[in-house]
């Protein structure tokens, strides 16, 4: 029985390796991140929910996943391009989880001594909050819960989203380094 599951796992990973070399899979990754970014902009500009500094950082992590999808789609059969896209995907997904967990902690355990930064800490050579204020200018408070769905706040849903992105990254990364039958013999 164990042998069956090992063979099935190798078969699935081999299929995933082939999928990672196809443009549509990378475009699907980019489209999913774009849909979440557009949702964030809807919450901000239509529902008038002000983003905080952590929200801005979480947006940036999501944009990293979007960019990874676009990079991977640009030349999915090129090993260097695919590796670069995988690295950006993994870094952005893990960074996003860490940010969302920290943001959730701020909301669940507010402190009278904690206040959000007024400005994001972007490098001086890339002040995104000045270049694109409609996307990166924080005006809200990190500890405020301004929206909930099924009893969970936005950062809690982002933990779910970034966790799924991280899980998919791990699965696809494992499949990418898996040697196929032709390479084994």
Curated annotation (Swiss-Prot):
TM region positions: 26-42, 61-76, 84-101, 157-175
Annotated InterPro entries: DiS_bond_form_DsbB/BdbC (IPR003752), Disulphide_bond_form_DsbB (IPR022920), DsbB (IPR050183), DsbB-like_sf (IPR023380)
Record keyword Secreted present: no
GO biological process: protein folding
Gene3D superfamilies to which the protein is assigned, alphabetical: DsbB-like
GO cellular component: plasma membrane
Protein name: Disulfide bond formation protein B
Record gene name: dsbB
């Amino acid at each position: 029985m164990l042998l069956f599951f090992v063979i099935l796992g190798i078969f699935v990973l081999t299929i995933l390796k082939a999928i990672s070399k196809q443009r549509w899979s990378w475009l699907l990754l980019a489209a999913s991140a774009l849909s979440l970014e557009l949702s964030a902009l809807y919450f901000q500009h239509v529902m008038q929910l002000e983003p905080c500094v952590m929200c801005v950082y979480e947006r940036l992590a999501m944009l990293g996943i979007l960019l990874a999808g676009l990079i991977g789609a640009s030349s999915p059969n090129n090993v260097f391009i695919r590796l670069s896209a995988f690295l950006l995907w993994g870094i952005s997904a893990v960074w996003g989880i860490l940010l969302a967990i920290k943001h959730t902690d701020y909301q669940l355990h507010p402190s009278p001594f904690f206040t959000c930064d007024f400005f994001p800490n972007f490098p001086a050579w890339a002040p995104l909050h000045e270049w694109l204020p409609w996307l990166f200018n924080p005006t809200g408070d990190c500890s405020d819960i301004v929206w909930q769905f099924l009893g969970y706040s936005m950062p809690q849903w982002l933990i779910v989203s970034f966790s799924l992105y991280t899980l998919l990254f791990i699965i696809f990364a494992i499949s990418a380094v898996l040697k196929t039958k032709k390479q084994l013999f």
